[in-house]
Amino acid sequence: FNSEDVFEIFINSYAELYDPHTNYFSPVNADRFEINMSKTFEGIGARLQQDIEYTTIFSIMPGGPAYRSKSLEKGDKIIGVAQGDEGNFEDIIGWRLDDVVSRIKGPKASVVRLLVIKKESSIDAFPDTVRLVRDRVDVVDEDATFDIVPFNSNDRQFNIGVIKIPSFYINFEDAQKGVKDYKSVTRDVKRCIDSLKTLSVDGIIIDLRNNGGGSLQEAIDLTGLFIETGPVVQIKSSNGRIEIEKDFDKQIHYDGPLLVLNNSFTASS
């Protein structure tokens, strides 16, 4: 543990005494939370993992700089990182994963160079130098997605659309800037519904199992796709005051047969 880890543990232990739903995020975990909410970040587009004292590639994100370069693959070891085309390499063997990630991530259009030992090479092999230009990376494999599940009942086949919603995400920064096509779960689910309508499904299942929560406003807006108007959620403060959050958009995007799935790991729904 470093000092930030210890401070985070202490503050969260203290906060839970008064409110089990209050959490403190260290700078590193706050950055992770922001990525989880916005489903986008600036970097090379690779998931990393700790393998004893080495940092290895766990997966490559489709469309990112690492994916486009075709120079990295799962299992490769990163042993050095350098900033720009002229920066000196830092030996990162034995580093914490958080510290390695902080060196590899960076602003869009900036250059990072990596010393990489390919997965099929021995650890004492001469490393390859991989030059990557950082870019905006969309975490598309954690977006809301849909599938069609057919089943038979009374000698009739039904096609049911299943929309999987992993979290209530939104890119707050783009939304506040007025970016026209900012990313949000409500927009993605709306596109899923449009696709399922085109395919003439007989009903829709909203799968919220293991949904960890996210933006309360997105949960309200998402509910608004299925109702005309009205109350969606109540918020009770410590002084007993109750606030009712409503959906005011009268447009109903889907009014057919609907089923919602959740489990004990479902939040904000």
Predicted ranges, named:
Residues 75:
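Conserved catalytic motifs of ABC-family nucleotide-binding domains
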Residues 25-41, 50, 56-61, 65-68, ...:
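Cleft-lining beta-strand/loop regions that shape enzyme active-site pockets
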Residues 1-43:
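Extended, domain-scale alpha-helical bundle/helix-rich regions
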